[in-house]
A protein has these predicted regions:
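Histidine-centered, transition-metal-coordinating active-site segments
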Residues: 26-51, 93, 98-99, 203-220
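Cationic, low-complexity basic patches in intrinsically disordered or flexible, solvent-exposed regions
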Residues: 7
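Conserved hydrophobic/aromatic pocket- or pore-lining residues that grip, position, or stack substrates
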Residues: 90
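Active-site flanking loop/helix segments enriched in acidic
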Residues: 62-86, 143-145
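Non-catalytic interface/linker regions that flank or bridge core catalytic/transmembrane domains
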Residues: 11, 15-69
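Divalent metal-dependent catalytic cores for phosphoryl transfer on phosphate-bearing substrates
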Residues: 77, 85, 97-220
Length: 220
């Protein structure tokens, strides 16, 4: 358990030392970095999460594009491997913020909510090409675009649905994933609804802040 009495706790060293090599648009992480991210992601899941259905969920992610997909088309993590990288960044930030919770947090629940909050983006992006003149020569330049094949209506709610196809979530985990975008998610109902979720489930607020920090401070 992660408790409020722990002012600092172990955070994976890669939170501080992992190289940021992927910021040029569509440049992508090199294959070694993507493999390292995959190894770390799977390792955390198998060491921390002990729940029926985990291996089926991981098998789906391995067969899909989770480990090579971008986190967005043009903003944070808009490069190959960006989605997995972002998920790990949110996990690291959430662990760093967990001491703020007034009640002890389950390390398993924190890992589930942070690492899987964006699985709605699996098989969500595709690559297209546009012409761009570079040094006087027209070239085809690849770029990411959205190819939504399953319209669910909500970002976080889609992740909750997809996870629970394989593995059950607690109400706290479901709320944390569903509300991770905070008040910017137009499908979340009223501002009061989100505030109530954060008040009832500290993990939901922590994952939201971790997601914002990873997006706007680390991955720009």
């Amino acid at each position: 358990m992660i408790t409020a009495s722990e002012p600092l706790f172990y955070i994976h060293l890669s939170f501080y030392t992992a190289p940021r090599m992927c910021y040029t648009s569509f440049q992508g992480c090199d294959e070694m970095n993507i493999d390292e991210q995959k190894t770390r992601f799977l390792g955390i899941c198998r060491e921390t999460i002990h729940r029926e259905g985990l291996e089926e969920l991981l098998d789906w992610l391995l067969k899909a594009d989770f480990f090579t997909a971008p986190a967005s088309t043009r903003y944070h993590g808009a490069y190959a491997g960006g989605l997995c990288e972002h998920s790990l960044d949110v996990y690291d930030y959430a662990r760093k913020l967990a001491f703020l919770s007034p009640t002890a947090l389950s390390e398993e629940s924190l890992a589930i909510a942070a690492l899987f909050h964006d699985v709605c983006k699996v098989n969500f992006y595709t690559t297209e090409y546009r012409n761009k003149k570079i040094d006087g020569v027209w070239q085809e330049i690849p770029f990411y675009t959205v190819d939504e094949r399953y319209h669910f209506g909500g970002h976080g709610s889609k992740s909750v649905y997809q996870i629970q196809y394989f593995m059950k979530l607690t109400p706290e985990e479901a709320a944390a994933i569903n509300c991770h975008m905070g008040f910017s998610d137009g499908n979340m109902g009223t501002v009061r609804d989100v505030s109530d979720a954060y008040e009832q489930y500290p993990l939901a607020w922590i994952v939201h802040v971790a997601d914002e920090a990873a997006t706007f401070l680390l991955e720009r």
